[in-house]
Regions:
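Short, hinge-like loop/turn segments at secondary-structure boundaries
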Residues: 23-28, 129-131, 169-170
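Short, surface-exposed loop/helix-turn segments at secondary-structure junctions
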Residues: 46-50, 85, 89, 93, ...
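Short alpha-helical scaffolding segments that buttress acidic/His motifs in well-ordered protein cores
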Residues: 20-21, 67-75
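Gly/Ser-rich, acidic/histidine-flanked active-site/gating loops
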Residues: 1-30, 35, 107
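Glycine-rich phosphate/pyrophosphate-binding loop
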Residues: 42-69
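Structural helix-boundary/capping segments
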Residues: 1, 5, 35, 40, ...
Length: 197
């Protein structure tokens, strides 16, 4: 109806994207946030009498549990003896995932996937298991690590909760992604439906 030819494809390497992301992103965060020592960057401690006390009292100040968890994970991945096994290998797999997407865009102008494997959380709900929370990113992470443009639009409702639909384009294909998503929204009414709160 919208002038698109639709067919299925498979990107098997994207199965590794979540692991790749949760090695690369925490490693980069760890490297960037290591400067927050409370002296030049970060929250300083006015009550410390030594630099060691200042560092100890301010090192984690201002960071939530999830940020601290990711900094520790990244520091581990970048540490001696683990850099090649984790960070370097993750970067290599990232390159393969990017290439797989690039190859798919030789055949397709855009890809369409769910935004998340689950419906939206109910207000106030959350998952206390960090791994399960990370799994909610399984559809969007591959696109991010490949450096591609994407947009999520309302794609329907399941059990009264909204479901997202993700449009993905080739590198620098932002206009294609926006046009495809806009055409979908003009043809559907999901973006005008609001769940009862």
């Amino acid at each position: 109806n919208l002038g698109a030819n639709v067919s299925e494809t498979s990107l098997p390497l994207t199965d590794h994207a979540l692991a790749v992301y949760y090695i690369i992103a925490p490693s980069e965060a760890s490297a960037n946030l290591s400067r927050y020592d409370g002296v030049k960057y970060g929250l300083g401690s006015l009550n410390a009498s030594t630099s060691a006390q200042a560092t100890e009292s301010t090192r984690g100040a201002g960071f939530g549990d999830e940020v601290k968890r990711r900094i520790l994970l990244g520091t581990y991945a970048l540490s001696a003896g683990y850099y090649d096994a984790f960070y370097k290998k993750a970067q290599q797999v990232r390159t393969l995932i990017r290439r797989e997407f690039t190859d798919s865009f030789l055949k397709f102008d855009a890809l369409v996937t769910p935004t998340s494997p689950n419906v939206a959380f109910k207000i106030g709900d959350k998952i206390n298991d960090p791994f399960q929370m990370y799994m909610n990113d399984v559809c969007t992470i591959p696109v991010n690590i490949a450096g591609l443009p994407s947009i999520s639009v309302p794609g329907g409702v399941s059990d009264g909760l909204p479901v997202g639909l993700q449009f993905i384009g080739p590198q620098f294909g932002d206009t294609t992604v926006i046009r495809a998503a806009a055409a979908y929204q003009r043809a559907t009414n999901w973006h005008n439906n609001h769940p009862l709160i």
